[in-house]
């Protein structure tokens, strides 16, 4: 119920924001355009935003005959979580990453990249998939897909502000825009930052919650902790062709290494996430090397984690 209220609040806030920006850019004509745009975006956000995101990344649905191990892990973890079996998609990119989308647990999708399947062992893959199913269980997925669509709308308005500054606003008359030429250029610069802030308002805490819930679904935190360590090591080496508006949907930031993306990161630090899973203190020199931990330390860390959940 809490996340349903958040979804309504997000839709309301974004509608108001689009109307204000439209009015500032193009006066009455701009506000009318923004109103039409907001109504359309609200409708499509609920019914089609998941399909748009999947199409954006050219993700392909797979069945047990095409990806038996992947499908089997998702099936087992879904049963552990008490969730309906989601659809399973593979993204044709070598950068290791994953996300979940959909409007509710009955219409959920889990998508992983080819790079993730190549990089992770079975336990680590289960940890990643459990994290994504945790987003489904916690009903984060609708908020995430709405935020992606709305952030894209803000980016579109930024582009309109830029061209409006060049050609004189929506109606071709400088008087239509309360901002004027300089103001519209400023809007074109600030709107992408606004898009990043929208993603951040989804709250980084949902990643911590998904990590904890995912560890419970998987049965232990070790697989996810090791997977996050690997993702941290490889995310900078293999760039992902990702849209900034969807960055918050992935298990790790797909825009790693880009200074502006880091400044407005939609994810908490990986070393902190790993530390919470393992019960260790985050290392100041970087993410703990999870795969290099001894078996005894891993068992002790897992015990600390489960004790903290009691």
Curated annotation (Swiss-Prot):
Bound cofactor: record note: Binds 1 zinc ion per subunit.
KW Cell membrane (keyword) present: yes
Essential cofactor(s): Zn(2+)
A GO term from the CC aspect: plasma membrane
Compositionally biased intervals (Basic and acidic residues): 293-310
Membrane topology field: Multi-pass membrane protein
Subcellular location as annotated: Cell inner membrane
EC number: 3.4.24.-
Keyword terms, alphabetized: Cell inner membrane, Cell membrane, Hydrolase, Membrane, Metal-binding, Metalloprotease, Protease, Transmembrane, Transmembrane helix, Zinc
Transmembrane domains' residue ranges: 7-27, 29-49, 141-161, 178-198
Entry keyword Protease: yes
Source organism superkingdom: Bacteria
Active-site positions on this chain: 132
GO molecular function, one term: zinc ion binding
InterPro entries found in the cross-reference section: HtpX_protease, Pept_M48_protease_HtpX, Peptidase_M48
Residues holding Zn(2+): 131, 135, 207
Database matches in PANTHER family: PROTEASE HTPX
Family: Belongs to the peptidase M48B family.
Listed name of the protein: Protease HtpX homolog
């Amino acid at each position: 119920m809490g996340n349903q209220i958040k979804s309504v609040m997000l839709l309301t806030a974004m509608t108001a924001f689009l109307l204000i920006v439209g009015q500032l850019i193009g006066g009455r004509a701009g506000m009318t355009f923004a109103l039409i745009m907001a109504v359309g975006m609200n409708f499509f956000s609920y019914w089609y935003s998941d399909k748009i995101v999947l199409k954006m990344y050219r993700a392909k649905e797979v069945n047990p005959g095409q990806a038996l191990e992947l499908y089997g892990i998702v099936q087992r973890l879904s049963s552990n979580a008490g969730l309906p079996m989601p659809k399973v998609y593979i993204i044709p990119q070598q950068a290791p990453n994953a996300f979940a989308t959909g409007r509710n647990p009955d219409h959920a999708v889990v998508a992983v990249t080819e790079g993730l399947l190549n990089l992770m062992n079975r336990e680590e893959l289960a940890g990643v998939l459990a994290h994504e199913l945790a987003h489904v269980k916690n009903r984060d997925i609708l908020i995430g897909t709405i935020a992606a669509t709305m952030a894209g709308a803000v980016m579109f308005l930024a582009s309109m502000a830029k061209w409006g500054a060049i050609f004189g606003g929506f109606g071709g008359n400088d008087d239509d825009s309360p901002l004027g030429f300089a103001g519209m250029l400023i809007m074109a610069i600030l709107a992408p930052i606004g898009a990043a802030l929208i993603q951040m308002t989804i709250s980084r805490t949902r990643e911590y919650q998904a990590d904890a819930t995912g560890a419970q679904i998987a049965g232990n935190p070790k697989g996810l902790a090791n997977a996050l360590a690997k993702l941290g090591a490889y995310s900078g080496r293999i760039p992902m062709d990702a849209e900034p508006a969807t960055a918050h949907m992935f298990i790790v930031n797909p825009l790693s290494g880009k200074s502006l993306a880091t400044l407005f990161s939609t994810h908490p630090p990986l070393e902190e996430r790993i530390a919470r899973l393992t019960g260790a203190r985050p290392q100041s020199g970087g993410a703990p090397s999870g795969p290099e931990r001894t078996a005894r330390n891993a068992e002790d860390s897992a015990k600390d984690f489960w004790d903290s959940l009691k």
